[in-house]
Regions:
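Conserved small/polar residues in nucleotide/adenosyl-binding loops
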Residues: 2-5
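Non-catalytic, solvent-exposed segments at the cell envelope interface
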Residues: 32-42, 48-50, 57, 61, ...
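Transmembrane alpha-helices and immediately adjacent membrane-cytoplasm interface residues
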Residues: 11-32
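N-terminus-biased targeting/localization segments
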Residues: 10-17, 64, 83-84
Length: 412
């Protein structure tokens, strides 16, 4: 049963309503920042162990630096190596066959430094779970690549559509390629004024569009947002019209710009140095991020984390629609610019805003999630020989959620 929330209309359209009138009045400059999603950025780094006394390339003179071509394009890696040699010509570079060996060689002091694409940091975590906190970058290079428009556009004011929302596990630039840590399907029917928010666990075992093999859904983001959208479209058996993407910086910045949020915590637990108590709790950006990421504290970790992500998003929605924020939301709009992107066009967004202003309609929304069973197994597309945690989809859950999405699209 859909729950009626008066004029609180859903995560997506509420955000648009809060920001929309300001966007229109201030022109398209901020909106263009959000909708200009035509590039992706790969962040390469030469890293050493954090305990190392090495802090610059000049301290690696005549030493060998290992890198891996297991997933990267040789052309891009050669470009990065050439840039590093311009900085320090005496550097030598050797190839390691796998990311697993690359990490082991660094930790075993076989080499003092390795060159990596940080999108693949998760590949090291099987053997070195705290990899990201145990290394430091001493040199970096970013490669930007043009991305073709992969949206399937419709007339958003009178045709049902789907938006995929991705939360990537990085800080900094929103265009950085990384794993997709949060995965939500937003199904919108502008005719019936219904919205369905469906979450999918990051470790869901699905066929990746680029690899044609199964792996955890989060790894689809390594090849860019277009690959995750294709993967999800194939899994759902329907078009995904648009996508929107946020990262850790986005969440922290947006929550803090809102002056914090009030979350209805469902159980006592601790995570990330923060303590959460049953009941309503005020959270700042970092507290909200830790709350929405934690899974190890719970027996049903992945499913609980998905619910907490929805809790945080709904708390943000409620705060956005409060009179205190509505009368002072230019700071929120400024915060969003640069840490949120979508391939919806500016005209699509303004059309939705104008529709809502004109009809002042009440919307209904429903929250659902795909479920499954957690297993430890080998065979994933990216790390086939490593025994990793995956969530095997529950067939009944898949059928139920696919039908729910179809029902909203079909006006039921």
């Amino acid at each position: 049963m859909y729950k009626r929330q008066g004029k609180v209309i859903s995560l997506l359209l509420s955000v648009l309503m809060v920001f929309g009138s300001v966007m229109i009045n201030k022109g398209y400059s901020t909106l263009d920042d959000i909708t200009n999603s035509n590039t992706k950025s790969a962040h390469y780094a030469i890293v050493v162990l954090k305990s190392s006394k090495i802090n610059s390339l000049s301290e690696l003179q005549n030493e060998s630096i290992e890198y891996c071509l297991q997933y990267d394009k040789e052309k891009d890696m050669n470009q990065v190596i050439a840039e590093a040699k311009k900085k320090e010509s005496s550097l030598n570079f050797d190839v390691a066959m796998t990311y697993s060996k690359l990490g082991d060689d660094l930790y075993n002091n076989t080499v003092n430094a390795i060159l990596i694409n940080t999108a693949y940091n998760g590949m090291f975590e099987d053997n070195h779970p705290d990899f990201q906190n145990e290394v430091k970058e001493i040199w970096t290079s970013d490669i930007e690549t043009k991305v073709k428009d992969f949206s399937t556009r419709v007339s958003v004011t009178n045709t049902p559509f789907i938006i995929y929302i991705s939360g990537i596990d990085t800080y900094g630039s929103i265009t950085t390629v990384s794993r997709s840590d949060v995965n939500m399907i937003v199904t919108v029917n502008p005719n019936t004024k219904k919205i369905l928010l469906t979450s999918i666990p990051r470790d869901y075992y699905v066929t990746l569009a680029n690899m044609k093999k199964k792996d955890k859904l989060t790894h689809s983001g390594i090849a860019g947002p277009e690959n995750t959208v294709k993967t999800m479209a194939q899994f759902l058996g329907t078009d995904i019209n648009y996508y929107a993407r946020v990262n850790f910086t986005s969440l922290v910045t947006m929550v803090d710009a809102l002056g914090g949020i009030t979350v209805n915590v469902d159980q006592d637990f601790s995570a990330g140095g923060y303590t959460y108590k049953l009941g309503l709790q005020q959270m700042n950006g970092k507290e909200a991020l830790a709350y929405s990421r934690e899974r190890h504290s719970f027996a049903d970790g992945d499913n609980v984390r998905v619910k907490h992500q929805q809790d945080v998003l709904m708390a943000m929605l409620n705060k956005m629609m409060s009179s205190a924020v509505i009368t002072n939301y230019t700071s929120v709009l400024t915060a969003v610019s640069g840490c949120f992107e979508t391939n919806m066009s500016a005209s699509d967004i303004t059309d939705l805003i104008k529709m809502q202003i004109n009809d002042n309609a009440s919307w209904t929304f429903k929250q659902k999630q795909f479920t499954g069973t957690g297993v430890m197994q080998t065979g994933g597309a990216y790390m086939p020989d490593s025994k990793l945690y995956y969530m095997i989809p529950n067939d009944d859950s898949v059928k139920e959620n696919l039908q729910a999405i179809k029902d909203v699209l079909n006006g039921k």
